[in-house]
Amino acid sequence: MFVWGKNDLNPEQEKAIYNENSILLIACPGSGKTRTITYKIAYELSKLESNKQYIVAITYTNRAADEIKERIELLGVDTEQLWIGTIHSFCVEWILKPYHMYIEELRFGYDIINTNDTENYLVSLCASYSTPKKKITYWDCLCYCFTSEGLKINCTKPTIKETVELIIRDYYQNLKEKHEIDYELILYYSYCLLKENKSICKTLSNIFPYILIDEYQDTKELQYMILGAILKTGKENKAFIVGDPNQSIYGNLGGFPMDKAQLENVTGLYYDELSLSYNYRSSSLLVSYFDYFKTYANKIEAVGKTKDYQSVISYNKTVSVEDLENEIVRVIKTNIDEYRISPNEICILAPQWIHLSGLTRNLMARLPQYSFDGPGMAPFARDIDNFWYKLSRIILTDSTPGLYIRRLRWASEIVTNLLSIGVTNIDLSAKQILYICNSISINEQDGLEYLKKFFDAFLERVNIDINQNKYLKMHYDAFLIALKNVLIV
């Protein structure tokens, strides 16, 4: 049984972990949510009685999944029986890959397109439908999602509503003809399979006796229905659902927090509702100010080292959009030079990532002495399921002891990917993949050319002909096109 030190967790966190029932955990900002999830997973892994069962953890991003898994491994816990990742990755691996033949549109195979492909398709359709008097953009078309009832389009601009609906329906008709699916269809087809084939639900409920869901406040209706279908079918299945309704930021994309009664109806489980109310990150002034923006009444208490810090809260109503960048530069320099705030403790937020993409690059040019992490920094970050993106993570990180576990896990993904696409003429372990990558030396200053030459050297070392594998070639072309497009911007 997994045990932890006396001061590793606070009483609220321990209560959530030790509870044997299904849990709805409302975790305020800075409350140690990730730490609680990490220890809960480790605890449940130690309780598994069969090597055929898995604990599954659904995270909102792949970065969150990597962080949690790495934390568990650092605790010395074996993660062989843990599956952790996004809901889309879960659906592809456990529902679509083994059962897609039961969907008429997918039974002869399918290709998964990425967000860059979707954008290119929609941009092309927008251009064909636009007129000099009625111009329609890609952003106008981001008003659709799939629910359990099918495609829903919610264009709020009356003058282009009808045309936008035509564009989106044409987009999905084109995907159907090409046997392609996007992230929305991944969810919809997965739901359809579970709805029409109860035996699939039964199989998955036997494999996954315990399901954890992180950031549940941004979960879509289809995602609730997919996980609910699995949980409802099992006899003794349990769920650990974590999030904060006050932090829901994807309502416009269909994400919303279900209340306890709704969750119980969808999953067929009874939940103990618990909370994490201690904020270790912010000052008391910031915590109090947050009360003005709450939509869900919960208790938050600042208890960290910075609880007495005299935060400055200001609202600039006069800066123009043309001068916004200059003002942000001024604020950054003021906080670093005058208030002695560490650069890695400064965060810039915006309503959408697109608002930050150009800004990030401009700030890098104007403040080269500081390191930035944000949209536009990693040109392939939006294509996390691409094989060459996964390989690039290994290529572009140092082979240091501190990164060994993470890079070894990435190498394991490479091995799994190669086997899943039918590359059986090689016999490589994750350690051998790492050794090959570490031994390749490329003398090239241009980033794009460096990666291309590294890819060529890697393929030669592992004896793979990319032109003989449709999957690798398709991902290679898509990866380089996306990379070139970002570098041109």
What are these regions (language model features)?
Residues 1-26, 31, 35-36, 54-56, ...:
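Accessory N-terminal region flanking or inserted into the helicase ATPase core
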Residues 1-102, 202:
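P-loop NTPase Walker
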Residues 50-53, 75-82, 98-113, 128-134, ...:
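Short, polar/flexible loop-turn hinges at active-site or ligand-entry regions and domain interfaces
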Residues 101, 221-222, 226-308:
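Conserved RecA-like helicase ATPase core segment
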Residues 104-177, 427-473:
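Coupling/switch/interface segments within P-loop NTPase motor domains and analogous charged loops
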Residues 215:
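Walker B catalytic acidic pair
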Residues 269-272, 278-367:
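Helicase P-loop NTPase motor core
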Residues 344-489:
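Core RecA-like ATPase module of SF1/SF2 helicases and allied nucleic-acid translocases
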